[in-house]
């Protein structure tokens, strides 16, 4: 199970021979919507951390915006939770309720 949030410094490519994208979950500990969404996110990550989507490996990163405001600012996060996909060429915001099926569809459609 994923514990807590990562900092921007925890982001790395653990799969150097694959094309890698990053899916960020931006939240804060005090947000009730983040607390509600976090278990669904963690379950989705657990189910998909070793899979590829359309040939691309996805790094899943939780960001605590209170502790890593620079990363939140970089991705223009203004509300919580916010989920964004960074493909290297584009940043795409996920605009649905963070549920496993919707996240899977988002990655399949975006990559």
Task: List where the protein language model places each region.
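N-terminal targeting signals for export/organelle localization
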Residues: 1-10
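Local sequence-structure signature of Cys/Sec-based thiol-disulfide redox active-site neighborhoods
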Residues: 13-50
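Thiol-based oxidoreductase modules, predominantly thioredoxin-like and allied folds used
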Residues: 26, 45, 50-70, 97
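Conserved beta-strand elements of beta-rich interaction domains across eukaryotes
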Residues: 28-30, 67, 90
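Extracytoplasmic/secreted proteins, especially bacterial periplasmic and envelope-associated proteins
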Residues: 36, 40-43, 70, 98, ...
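A short glycine-leucine-enriched loop at secondary-structure breakpoints
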Residues: 73-78
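Non-catalytic, surface beta->alpha helical segment in thiol-disulfide oxidoreductase systems
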Residues: 79-111
């Amino acid at each position: 199970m994923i514990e807590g949030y990562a900092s921007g410094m925890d982001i790395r490519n653990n799969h150097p021979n694959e094309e890698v994208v990053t899916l960020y979950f931006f939240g804060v500990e005090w947000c009730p919507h983040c607390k509600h969404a976090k278990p669904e996110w963690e379950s989705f990550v657990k189910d998909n951390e070793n899979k590829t989507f359309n040939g691309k490996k996805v790094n899943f990163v939780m960001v605590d915006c209170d502790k890593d405001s620079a990363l939140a600012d970089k991705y223009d996060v203004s509300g919580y939770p916010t989920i964004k996909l960074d493909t290297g060429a584009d940043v795409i915001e996920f605009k649905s309720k963070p549920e496993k099926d919707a996240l899977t569809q988002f990655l399949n459609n975006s990559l």
